[in-house]
């Protein structure tokens, strides 16, 4: 990732050097906190939005696009000013529905870092209908601004007029708001407990079927993923995708995976088979499944 980032940001530019130094200090995680953002803006006389626009090619460099070879970068800006990178993630030799779109990537990245509200979405290409619908599920969606290289300060609902969303199904819960499904993490295996805790934070008001993923890497690091459901159903993002996306955006190598656990309360639906199908194309490590 280090060399790819350096190729994306030519190092004969002082701003690019400063950005690379920040990323190097955090092992190439695609994230800048508010203090880092403000320091860069101050040192190089940039607005927050101009810095985000400058970072879009960098965000796109985290893409995996074996199918389309079309890299999309996104930056979700949290309500406190943190920058969460996102990029489209494609999975060859699996169903195209397994894909993670860049806006989904940035939002789920923010969610797994416990962000509660997105104020702005900055992206290098106009959001597709799938992503517009996904963003409409967010806590505070009515206040989100969309920024493109050719057009800034656009309300999300200008891209999705007469929108269908949670309110049409009498659902008050929104993605990024605090969730609790009263799942108890009392297993003797800590990795199973982490998958249960992730499931407990799922957003699944339509199926009430939470599931979570916990991935153990060979160095002892653990990445978890939660299920993000959508009022329109198809734009929903399974927990395996949110976990893999977080791994990609934080420079984890899938070849270093040691164990993968899924914990699921499958009341109306199950993601077990879908997860196993995708994993079979990525790793020889088998899914460990725990029914809740």
Swiss-Prot record:
Gene Ontology molecular functions: cytidine deaminase activity; identical protein binding; zinc ion binding
Record-level GO cellular component terms: cytosol
Transmembrane stretches, start-end: none
InterPro entries (UniProt xref): APOBEC/CMP_deaminase_Zn-bd, CMP_dCMP_dom, Cyd/dCyd_deaminase_Zn-bd, Cyt/Deoxycyt_deaminase, Cyt_deam_dimer, Cytidine_deaminase-like, Cytidine_deaminase_bacteria
Residue ranges of domain CMP/dCMP-type deaminase in the record: 47-167, 186-292
Keywords for the protein's UniProt record, in alphabetical order: Hydrolase, Metal-binding, Zinc
Cofactor note: Binds 1 zinc ion.
GO terms for biological process, alphabetical: cytidine deamination
Cofactor dependence: Zn(2+)
Binding site for Zn(2+): 101, 128, 131
Active site positions: 103 (proton donor)
Source taxon at top rank: Bacteria
The reaction(s) this protein catalyses: cytidine + H2O + H(+) = uridine + NH4(+); 2'-deoxycytidine + H2O + H(+) = 2'-deoxyuridine + NH4(+)
Residue positions binding substrate: 88-90
Keyword Zinc appears in the UniProt entry: yes
Entry keyword Zinc: yes
EC number: 3.5.4.5
Family: Belongs to the cytidine and deoxycytidylate deaminase family.
Complexes and interactors: Homodimer.
Function: This enzyme scavenges exogenous and endogenous cytidine and 2'-deoxycytidine for UMP synthesis.
Listed name of the protein: Cytidine deaminase
Organism this protein belongs to: Haemophilus influenzae (strain PittGG)
Species lineage: Bacteria, Pseudomonadati, Pseudomonadota, Gammaproteobacteria, Pasteurellales
Gene, per the UniProt record: cdd
